[in-house]
Amino acid sequence: MSVNVPLHKWRSADPAILIGRRCIAQTDQDVIIDGRLELIRHPDGAASLRFQGIGNDIIAHDPNTCSNSMSAGIRSLAIYGKE
C-alpha cells in the first residue's frame, strides 16, 4: 500500500523537479482537475507547469524571485510525489 504525501514546498521548488508529479487543482469555478504536470519554458526565461494534455497553466514560475505561484483561475492545489 502506498501513501501520497503532499509536497509542501512547491512554491520554492525548481520547476524541473515538479515534472511528472501528480497535481490536484481546484479552479475558481470549483472544477477539480487531477493529473500529471509538464513543464513549459518561455523565451523570456519564465516557465509554467500545466497538466499533461491540457493547455491551461496551473503554476507560474518567476525566474527573478525563483518562486512558483498559482496561475490565474486556480483557487487551490496540492502536488504529490512521483508514484
Question: What do the PLM-derived regions correspond to, one by one?
Answer:
Residues D14-I17, Q26, S48, H61, ...:
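Intrinsic disorder/low-complexity segments
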